[in-house]
Every structure is written in C-alpha cells, then in structure tokens.
Swiss-Prot record:
UniProt-listed GO biological process terms: translation
Similarity section: Belongs to the bacterial ribosomal protein bS6 family.
Name this protein carries in UniProt: Small ribosomal subunit protein bS6
Stored NCBIfam families: S6 (TIGR00166)
Pfam families, sorted: Ribosomal_S6
Role according to the record: Binds together with bS18 to 16S ribosomal RNA.
Source organism (scientific name): Dehalococcoides mccartyi (strain CBDB1)
Keyword Thylakoid in record: no
PANTHER family to which the protein is assigned, alphabetical: MITOCHONDRIAL 28S RIBOSOMAL PROTEIN S6, SMALL RIBOSOMAL SUBUNIT PROTEIN BS6M
C-alpha cells in the first residue's frame, strides 16, 4: 500500500447519521437540553453539525425496558465523523437519564 493510500484511509469524512435518544420521562427539560448540547459540542469539535432536531415527546415504549414503560424521544439528523459517533454513544451509555439510543449511518445503503 502506497503512503498516499494509507493517508486517505485514515482521513475521516463527514457522514450523514440519524440518532434517536430515548430519555426517562422524568428528565427535566434543562437536562434534555444539556444532553443535546453535549452531543452538539462533541460533533462540532470534529467539524460536524446538527441538520435537524425533533422532540417527539413522551411515547409508550414497544416493550418494557428496565422498569420503564414510557420514554421521551428525541430524533436528530446530523453530519458527523465516525469517531464522534463512538464518543457520543459512550457518553449516552453512561448517562442515567438515557434509556436507549441508536445511531444509524445513512450513507450506507
């Protein structure tokens, strides 16, 4: 492998992602905004950005997750680098307010 090919394989490009975050229904609005701000800051550090944020609100879960039957849903479309998504996923996994989350790469079809 040539040196230029090796460099190209290490360069991360921005990709389109959709992220759904399900929070506990008792999460204060300020905490919801703080979580979204943290996600935005993480992707902005690597030149990414939100393209759309929709608060779907409180909805019944399809099945019981832990002790929760309802969750507060937030849907986010964004441009981000894969390393940003890994960091966001780690941060959301350790947050006590987050019941579940899923990031989908929309560039892969």
């Amino acid at each position: 492998m040539a040196a230029s090919e090796l460099l190209k394989s290490r360069v991360e490009n921005l990709r389109d992602y959709e992220l759904v975050v399900i929070l506990t229904t008792d999460t204060p609005k300020e905490k919801v905004e703080a979580i979204l701000e943290g996600i935005s800051k993480t992707i902005a550090e690597k030149e990414g950005s939100f393209t759309e944020v929709n608060h779907w609100g409180k909805r019944k879960l399809a099945y019981l997750i832990g002790r929760y039957v309802e969750g507060y849903y937030v849907f986010i479309k964004m441009k981000a680098k894969p390393s940003s998504i890994r960091k966001i996923s780690t941060d959301l996994r350790i947050s006590e307010q987050v019941i579940r989350h899923m990031a989908i790469n929309m560039d892969e079809e």
